[in-house]
UniProtKB/Swiss-Prot annotation:
Residues 160-334 form the OBG-type G domain. CDD domains: Obg. It comes from the Bacteria. Pfam families: GTP1_OBG, MMR_HSR1. Keywords: Cytoplasm, GTP-binding, Hydrolase, Magnesium, Metal-binding, Nucleotide-binding. It comes from Azoarcus sp. (strain BH72). The lineage of its organism: Bacteria, Pseudomonadati, Pseudomonadota, Betaproteobacteria, Rhodocyclales. This is GTPase Obg. InterPro entries: G_OBG, GTP-bd, GTP-bd_Obg/CgtA, GTP1-OBG_CS, GTP1_OBG_dom, GTP1_OBG_dom_sf, OBG_GTPase, P-loop_NTPase.
Length: 408
């Protein structure tokens, strides 16, 4: 199946049903009053991440999706049936944005993640809602609200831990075949790889990582030259980049150092964050060099290239040096994942503390308010008691005057 990593679609939520303007009509009840029901809500459109999908090809041919309209309200206060929602399934890693405003809507980075794309319209009100003491037979009703309509841009960024980059024919596809079960096409000509390939590398039963191979880059890729610039987005979610270099090119005019530095410059032009990712240098095709020439060739390359974070020397075709590289990658990724989990746990703990503090402050405020209310009630009771005593005293004085008429 051809790989599609970009698409544009239109989603339209259902309109709400209209409210009804009807009146109760029964035998012996000449003026039954209004009984129009509300319209049903319109169906909404949702997106869900599905790990069983790996391309947006479905959305290149069908581009418009419309949810069901809500039914109109009926007599006898019958509500209209709500419209059916629709759910669109996308590959994990799909980024959805509004095509008109450019506003990001969702990043479906976790399998099963569900996001609302377009909200269905509310149903209209029946005339039953407009009955009042001065209008006993209203004919007013409201129409259903229109559902949301949005034009969306879909962009798939594959979820991989390690990304491969390099010039065409640097041996990237051969490397991914050597370390995983992926079987991309390989050949002795440039641009053998025309679309991204993913491979799962297992270092033991419980440890693995995903590696992504994209078409080779050439100088000027950031401005649109070649194929690789179309797929650089797939490296943005990776934790580390492997920069493969052909250390033994067939063409004597090819300078591996110049080509390697050109790739680094294209990364910088395309995306600064991608340029700043951890990047390991992998010197490939050592099997094409005589054993006594390998060390001098590697030393000369590193001296001309400049400082590197880490470098490895391999032969992807013969598997030489690949085992040490993948175990180094696994250790690095385990450390990265542990750091990510620790940061996430720290954020969750901080959020729990914030919520606990807010709850404590709210409880204290409620307790203070309750105490103030109790104090106010006590003062009111004291005032009532004083008023009652005063009234009793007045009543006693009045009774005394009535009992002794000579006291005047």
């Amino acid at each position: 199946m051809k790989f599609f990593d970009e698409a544009r679609i239109e989603v339209v939520a259902g309109d709400g049903g209209n409210g009804a303007a009807t009146f109760r009509r029964e035998k012996f009840i000449p003026r039954g009053g209004p009984d129009g029901g509300d319209g049903g809500r319109g169906g909404s459109v949702y997106a869900v991440a599905d790990r069983n999908l790996n391309t947006l090809v479905e959305y290149r041919f069908k581009r418009s999706f419309r949810a069901e309209r809500g039914e109109n309200g009926g007599s006898k206060d019958c509500y209209g049936k709500g419209g059916e929602d629709i759910t669109l399934h996308f590959p994990v890693g799909t980024v959805i944005s509004d095509l008109d405003s450019g506003e990001p809507i969702a990043d479906l980075d976790v399998d099963g993640k569900r996001v609302l794309l377009a909200q269905g319209g509310r149903g209209g009100l029946g005339n039953l809602h407009f009955k009042s003491s001065v209008n006993r037979a209203p004919r007013k009703r409201t129409m259903g609200q229109e559902g949301e309509r949005r034009n969306l841009h879909l962009e798939l960024k594959v979820l991989a831990d390690v990304g491969l980059l390099g010039m065409p024919n640097a041996g990237k596809s051969t490397f991914i075949r050597a370390v995983s079960a992926a079987r991309p096409k390989v050949g002795d000509y440039p641009f053998t790889t025309l679309q991204p390939n993913l491979g799962v590398v297992r270092t033991d039963e419980n440890r693995s990582f995903v590696i992504a191979d994209i078409p080779g880059l050439i100088e000027g890729a950031a401005e649109g030259a070649g194929l690789g610039h179309q797929f650089l987005r797939h490296l943005q979610r990776t934790h580390v980049l492997l920069h493969l270099v052909d250390l033994a090119p067939f063409d004597p005019e090819v300078d591996p150092v110049r080509d390697a530095l050109a790739i680094v410059e294209e990364l910088r032009k395309y995306d600064e964050s991608l340029y700043n990712k951890p990047r390991w240098l992998v010197l490939n095709k050592l099997d094409l060099l005589e054993p006594e020439d390998r060390a001098p060739r590697v030393a000369a390359f590193l001296e001309a290239y400049g400082e590197v974070e880490r470098h490895f020397e391999i032969s992807a075709l013969q598997g030489e040096g690949c085992r040490g590289l993948i175990f180094a990658l696994q250790d690095f990724l385990d450390s990265e994942r542990a750091n990510i989990h620790a940061q996430q746990a720290a954020r969750e703990a901080e959020e729990r503390q914030r919520l606990a503090a807010a709850q404590s402050a709210r409880s204290a405020a409620e307790a203070e308010a309750l105490e103030a209310d109790l104090a106010e009630d006590a003062l009111a009771e004291d005032a009532l008691a004083e008023d009652a005593l005063a009234e009793d005293a007045l009543d006693d004085d009045a009774d005394g005057e009535d009992a002794d008429p000579n006291a005047r």
